[in-house]
Amino acid sequence: MKKIILGWILLQACFYGAIAQNKINSNFANSWTDSVYNSLSEDERIAQLMVVRLSSIDSKTKLITFFDDKVAGLVKQYNIGGICLFQGGPVKQALILNKLQAAAKTPILICIDGENGVGMRMTDSVLPLPRQMMLGAVQDTNIIYQYGKIAGEQCKRMGIQVNYAPVVDVNNNPNNPVINDRSFGEDKYKVAQFGIQYMKGLQDVGVMACAKHFPGHGDVAVDSHLDLPVINKSMAQLDSLELYPFREIFKAGIGSVMVAHLYIPAIDSAAHRATSISKNNVTGLLRNQLGYQGLTFTDALEMQGVKKYFPGGEASVQSIIAGNDMLCLPEDVPAAISKIKDAIKDERLSWADIELHCKKVLAAKYQYGLSQLQPINTENLANDLNSKVNDMRKQVAENALTVLKKSDDIFFPMIAPEKPVTDEVVYVSIGTSSDNAFAKRMRNDYGAAVFYFNYKQDAARILSTVELIKKRYKKVVIGIHNYNRAPANNFGISKAAIDLVTQLQQQANSVTFVFGNPYAIKNWCTAKNLIACYEDDAIIQNIAIDLLQGKIAAKGKLPVTVCEEYKFGSGITTSVFSAHGGNRPCGHRQ
């Protein structure tokens, strides 16, 4: 009995001790926030709400331009609140950030648009993690959590406090030009579940996650970077689909949300009123109806979806009127600050509004460690950022590759012979002109002949090659490579390439691997044996060969519908081939 009483006393002590500690921490946070706020000028209080870009890349020349001198000027003159990292090497960016943070009166909130890790941006020396569509084919949610942790650890190593991820848009439009393979797929439950796991991975290592793009960017036909997309859905329709993942991830405790540039008349019918600058959307729907009180970021204000209709700093004014906390990438910071001050004079805004948003930003800075900021250590930086990427890519590939059709257990899996046999196997590589990892394995493991075709191949060569293959080779392996991620113009896949693959896959012993956006599979749904690989690199290609040989089991399921034959959730589960047992692995659909 004494032990029970003692245990109860200790439990109560721990409980009330935790409450007391939380109160102390809260008091420190409030004290720091108030102290910093009181030290700021009016211009600085407004500038704390702004996130500016550090670099950009020319889409044609691929040349990277850094704006560190310009940003340093904004830090010095206005005490800018945030910086968003884009292209450029990690060491260079880290050195610039160290310099800027040292010069800043108030620690700067560092953000990145790193949906698949910092390698999404720092492409010169950091490998990207798989995109979310490939993750959507995985069935083990712990992998998504571990993925989020790796992305978070990368951010921490780079001195980044906020990652603009995960994307929780439900991609229910296969022709979506801007979200597409950035989404976990078309199923709202999976999008919500995987989004929460990604969020937990980030936030468990001390990086703020950001759900985007509220209220849902998955069913658009226009890229909001170029114009304002229109979604003509009722509130009931939005509530049943698009809003579901946001509601769930809000309840799970996500630190921030990014608001999209969308025109949704059911939310706000004012002409050209994007959801990012709509009070009905941000204050009405997001804050009041859904009850979300975390930090809100606008999508980039340099995008044409809002800039086209609200130029010259007016988009910044409208963003704050709508109820946003942080303004991403206003093109002209001085003009935006001036416009916001004019709006206060005109009583469209108030200094109380600025105080509310500024203190929320400062509180987030305290929460994510900026009150005790340390410089980024650049020693071994790129190696540290890459240290877990390949293992995660391999783990995702082993769990995501999806066998959509398996018509012959005798042919597939295709066990590699002890000694490769000539004129037995041919590999036809579409979209390449030289050996990749898949082609090398086909040569080494099977003694396969390899034919290359680009997407501009003439019909005459295709016809002659098809005839040659039919006469000479018993087994045909086809790989579709290097097509575009975006669905415009059928992913850049030519009719000639479609016809070539269609003819080749009529062979009884043929198998087709599609290395890229799964929506492109619509072109080859009649394949005898068909595998979705989602992305295209050496790791994934080697895993695909292992799957072909029965060395690994197929576990993946389609995250989207690609044609009538293969809908969301399609995928055949296989077992590993046992050479000793002599049994061929049988596949079964789920």
Where are these regions (language model features)?
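Bacterial Sec-dependent N-terminal signal peptides
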Residues: 1-23
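Preference for extracellular/luminal or secreted protein segments
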Residues: 20-73, 279, 288, 310-590
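Second-shell residues forming the walls of enzyme active-site clefts
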Residues: 41, 83, 92-108, 118-120, ...
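Short acidic, glycine-rich surface-loop motifs adjacent to enzyme active sites
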Residues: 47, 53, 71-90, 174-175, ...
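Active-site mouth loops of central-metabolism enzymes
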Residues: 52-66, 133-145, 227-241, 304-310
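Short glycine-enriched loops at secondary-structure junctions
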Residues: 55-58, 112-120, 161-171, 211-217, ...
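Active-site-adjacent structural elements in enzyme catalytic domains
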Residues: 90-107, 139-157, 354, 359, ...
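A substrate-binding/cap region within the structured catalytic cores of diverse enzymes
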Residues: 137-160, 167-183, 188, 195, ...
